[in-house]
Amino acid sequence: MTNPEDPIDWRALAEEIGADPNRGGDAIARRAITSLLGDEAMRRAVDWYVEGRPAAEHASSVLRLLRPDAARSRCLEIYRTDPAPERRHLAVELFRVVARAEDLPLVGDLLADPDPAVQLWGMGVLDRLLWDGHVDADDAEPFLRMAERRPNPKVREKHTDLRAHLEPHE
């Protein structure tokens, strides 16, 4: 995190995040804010949420807006390595709001997880990727077919709901 007393060198920041210093936009702004806050702050925000600390939803909202790589990685690290089921569930729940299009293949891993709650949050990831416009129905199709075949009735129910929303309205 930068010292609040120091002015921001916007040109250096643009170079740091790989952006043309003469261009702007929401995606560039999110990367710049993430860079100013730092990866460690993003990882700590994930931990804050997973631990259920006060204002956890505030941390989630900031992470949802920024969708930083460090938060996505930390969510997956907790999901893959933490022995506590509740922490794994919360990590996947949070991953749902920070996931991006390139994370779509992870939906298959989540649906294949032996934990029914992780499977259901995997459907939440797919749902969010669809409705936030990160992926389209064609991209989601293999995972919808996978969900349809899962023995978990809640996953199949979520599959049915997603299919209904994806059908063209007449």
What are these regions (language model features)?
Residues 4-11, 35-48, 68-80, 100-112, ...:
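Amphipathic alpha-helical scaffolding segments comprising HEAT/armadillo-like alpha-solenoid repeats
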Residues 52, 83-84, 114-115, 151-152:
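Short inter-helical turns and helix N-cap capping residues of alpha-solenoid HEAT/ARM repeat scaffolds
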Residues 2-3, 15-36, 47-68, 86-100, ...:
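Structural detector for internal amphipathic alpha-helices that build alpha-solenoid repeat scaffolds
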